[in-house]
Amino acid sequence: MASPTLLRTFGSTLAALLLLTTCARAVPSIRYSWDACDPVVLDHEFVGPGHYVQTLSVTGLVLPFTSFEAHIAIGPGLFSAWAFYNGACQGAGRMTVSTAAGGCQTIPGLLVTANVVPGLTDPTAHLYVTASVPAGFTPDPTARYTLLRIDFDHTATTTGSLDPPGHCGSGDLPYCFGIESMAINAHSLPGRDFDVENGVLTWNLASTPGQCPFRVAVRPSTWGRLKSIYR
């Protein structure tokens, strides 16, 4: 029969191993939301010209944290209201990014770039985000940090399918935003390298927030192919 001391030692060792296993399984958790980081807002309605904001945030960060990438599909269709790319109705200049958002801490020195590119073979736009983190940042695993705050300037957006002079129509149409792929420190396997709390946002779909009724090209398997095309 095992002695009480041996049982206590075994119990302590088992508890430590379980704790280590739990910690090893813990991965950063990504949140995608309209407006601020918290609370989560899954749908936004077009209520008139103005600025509309989306955020990507993360909790559970541990060292090292050096880079972040995200690809987001926008669709269906390439309508004027969401044509935030060169040569289109809104143009690239009406979309701006920053690294601070309500409900989140900031990552000192975080550098973020983002651009929208129309699909080559599908009627979908693609938002590409890249970010780099300078050396010396020590994250708090319990804190939520802003990865991206993106401001869509819809001051020239209007309703209806036509584009009046100086304006971009179709602001009242339903739209979806779906995370195609993501990477932290160049590692891009969901469930192992990170978790995604919610991967879809909707626009003008208040009855089904965060649930896209359309076929939008959200294909994590295309991660490598997309990088090879657009880099």
Where are these regions (language model features)?
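Extracellular secreted precursors and ectodomains with disulfide-bonded cysteine-rich loops/domains
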Residues: 35, 87, 102, 166, ...
